[in-house]
Amino acid sequence: MKSRLSFIILLMSLSISGYAQQIVLTPQWTAQSQFAGYYVAQELGFYKEAGVDVIIEHTSASDKALNRMLNKKCNAITMLLFDAMCQIDHGVELVNILQTAQRSGHVIVVRDDQIKDIEDLRGKKVGIWRSNFNQLCLLIEKDYNLNIEWITFIQNINLYISGAIDATMAMIYNELYQLRASGYENKKVIYLADIGYDYPEDGLYITREYYEKYPEKAVAFAQASRRGWQWAHEHPEEALDIVMKVIEREDIPASRRHQEWMLREVLKQQIPTGESEPRFELNHEKVKALCELLLKHGRINNEINADQIKGR
């Protein structure tokens, strides 16, 4: 009887230990090609082969990724580097284990044809997200003393189409496609990367608690995720099939053509300017440049370097 009880206790302890090591990943938005590499890693068994139990749970308008992490509903999220540095400075225990986007995907799409460059936005009405994606734009306004009248939106392009604004912020992989598909393919686009604001964006972050408690699992998770992204680079059409399967399962309205555009642009972002292959680690010089911008505008109080962000 005692041996049987000991066996049951052992099984329970193993089960609890396995659950504790489980990784719940929450991307910063609903299912789309922006997160293709993670879907690939899960669908093709890369996580399982690496010995990590990964569940992907998407966010919603009322349950943001960072809030889910802070409330211990997940222990891994995707996040912009800009936002991550601010959160780390404010005491949030985050560790970057994989940097996916090496280049900026932020653009300004002009509607008023009199606007030729960033200086021409002075005093204009410009659409902007009601989310953390808006932070870099606000600092650029201060750098150029533009006195922009920001008009907030959540995710659609209706303000632009209606003519209520003179220009709009957009992501190269999302709203830019929507605008071009709506007949605005010839409008001028100002790429933030071209005016000196080319900072890394999306990265994969895990709680410091998990990183320190299960370092081997954290590394295996990062490596399997990287493998998923690399596979997406080599098999974009098949990766898109996997994305569409996830989108259908999540019951998200989305067109394959839009997701194809998004995947292509997201994969481009992973290749540093002037190079031909993707990189999946932080660029120390770009982190330093972004840190200087954040310090200049009082968004962070302490200098943060790439090693700190990587938990070293």
Please give the residue ranges for each predicted region.
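Bacterial N-terminal signal peptides that target proteins for export
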Residues: 1-7
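N-terminal hydrophobic or amphipathic helices and topogenic motifs
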Residues: 18-55, 273, 281-312
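Short, glycine-/small- and polar/acidic-enriched structural segments
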Residues: 21-153, 157-171, 198
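Structural motif detector for alpha-helix initiation sites
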Residues: 117-118, 208, 306
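Secondary-structure end/capping motifs
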Residues: 214-297
